[in-house]
Swiss-Prot record:
PROSITE patterns: IG_LIKE. It holds the Pfam family V-set. This is T-cell antigen CD7. A lipid is attached at residue 168 (S-palmitoyl cysteine).
Length: 210
């Protein structure tokens, strides 16, 4: 287990201890979430009673405001999370989605109900893990398979055609040899038969020198 995960678990255990009274008015979930680089996490902040808006802060390792959300108003997002924050729901039950996670996003996040007497929940610990080489290989494996399968088919057809060509060539040579052999046997018979037939039809001419 990484040091970040151990630290996150310790912080979560510490959060189980009784918190301040104002935490009873703001409920936040989950208490711990672990994700890989590039993934997304959801943090839900719900509260009751009158409030002006919801402020989510990062309180560890560095403290600063992440977002401020108010119904019917344009939300404010810290530039560190620009383009990576989405909202769903109302300010009394708000789900905040942080996407394209980075290692620097690891930390504790707390929701605060903004009103005359502000109240905040405990916190949500977000742990962002470095993407392992195995996960990267799995993400590339379907792409490699899609390329290798057509290639295997093409190679298979190539060798099949090559084998059929060799077989046809061998059969053709055997057939030619058989035809030649049969021609050699039959041609003398035909020639001799013709010659004997012609000899029978040709009259005898006496030799004048005898």
């Amino acid at each position: 287990m990484t040091q970040q995960a151990v630290l996150a678990l310790l912080l979560t255990l510490a959060g189980i201890l009784p918190g301040p009274l104002d935490a009873q008015d703001v409920h936040q979930s989950p208490r711990l979430t672990i994700a890989s680089e590039g993934d997304s996490v959801n943090i839900t902040c719900s509260t009751r009673g009158h409030l002006e808006g919801i402020l989510m802060k990062k309180i560890w390792p560095q403290a600063y405001n992440v977002i401020y959300f108010e119904d019917r108003q344009e939300p404010t997002v810290d530039r560190t999370f620009s383009g990576r924050i989405n909202f769903s729901g109302s300010q009394k039950n708000l789900t905040i989605t942080i996407s394209s996670l980075q290692l620097a996003d690891t930390g504790d996040y707390t929701c605060e109900a903004v009103r005359k007497v502000s109240a905040r929940g405990l916190f949500t610990t977000v742990v962002v893990k470095e993407k392992s080489s195995q996960e990267a290989y799995r993400s590339q494996e379907p792409l490699q398979t899609s390329f290798s399968f057509p290639a295997a088919i093409a190679v298979g057809f190539f060798f099949t055609g090559l084998l059929l060509g060799v077989v046809c060539s061998m059969l053709r040579k055997i057939q030619i040899k058989k035809l030649c052999a049969s021609g050699i046997k039959e041609s003398p018979c035909v020639v001799y038969e013709d010659m004997s037939y012609s000899n029978r039809k040709t009259p005898c001419i006496p030799n004048q020198y005898q």
